[in-house]
């Protein structure tokens, strides 16, 4: 059924299709009996999938990545779609329209997306109001970024303001310094710039704080950020954001689409490399959330055994449809049982621990 729906949706410009799907999901989730039925049909049921990460209980490891529900306007939908949690955002301290359209493109031959959305959102205060009214069925994380008009020199206060507004209402908070679509944002990944931002956010909230990084960092920069995260006692690292690399793309005309970040399978190999390096560096001292190019249960299992405590997806959901999260969770549960693991936690990093030193 979904392949037909996807073909029809792909006849519509991507951002319009996104809004249409959003309206349908919100409408369905607004009807409590329908929402409960969907959760019974699509939600995770095997208790082996549940885990406690940075003090938060997750019913299953695959969550909706930031960028899909930027303003938390479909908060009740994501548990019904089978996700174990959802990350809302990116939100900024001040509302902003983002970059001019067109700003979202399908790379169908690569099962990928190119976006240069530019943190379009209603602002952290509007999200805080929605979160305060919401009774979560699954954990809800919030991803915060820098307002475009805020100069880099005032980035600390900008992130602090967002953390103050949404931190107390979120299951966890992610500091996004890695989107390629806000000028100068990735420069904040340099340790000397990142340290005061993370320190300020940590001081502002008791909610677990993570940092989201780019896949395009050098290995030495990855090591520096990992060490800083441990030093500042962060809850974890989200790896990775979209890539600016165009290597290996097969979709015709991609060079004419302009700048932006690529998500989906073209990102997978680098996302795994980054995950493995981070896990080898920090071990169990930080929780690692792996995102980028996860399409199947095999992909998900590779990330878990490479060191990911949690997973996220966005592009895979668009191409995979309503059963995507369910199929991945069922595949993970099957591999846990077949491998003799008593819990998801036991499997995290198991492939790295077996490697000879």
Curated annotation (Swiss-Prot):
Its cofactor is FMN. It is found in: Cell membrane. Substrate binds at residues 70, 115-119, 176, 181, 241-242. Keywords: Cell membrane, Flavoprotein, FMN, Membrane, Oxidoreductase, Pyrimidine biosynthesis. FMN binds at residues 66-70, 90, 143, 176, 212, 240, 264, 293, 314-315. It is a peripheral membrane protein. GO terms for cellular component: cytoplasm; plasma membrane. The active site is at 179 (nucleophile). Pathway: Pyrimidine metabolism; UMP biosynthesis via de novo pathway; orotate from (S)-dihydroorotate (quinone route): step 1/1. Binds 1 FMN per subunit. GO terms for molecular function: dihydroorotate dehydrogenase (quinone) activity; dihydroorotate dehydrogenase activity. The keyword Membrane applies. Its EC number is 1.3.5.2. GO terms for biological process: 'de novo' pyrimidine nucleobase biosynthetic process; 'de novo' UMP biosynthetic process; pyrimidine ribonucleotide biosynthetic process. SUPFAM superfamilies: FMN-linked oxidoreductases. Pfam families: DHO_dh. Belongs to the dihydroorotate dehydrogenase family. Type 2 subfamily. PANTHER family: DIHYDROOROTATE DEHYDROGENASE (QUINONE), MITOCHONDRIAL (PTHR48109:SF4), DIHYDROOROTATE DEHYDROGENASE (QUINONE), MITOCHONDRIAL-RELATED (PTHR48109). NCBIfam families: PRK05286.1-2, PRK05286.2-1, PRK05286.2-5, pyrD_sub2. This is Dihydroorotate dehydrogenase (quinone). The gene is pyrD.
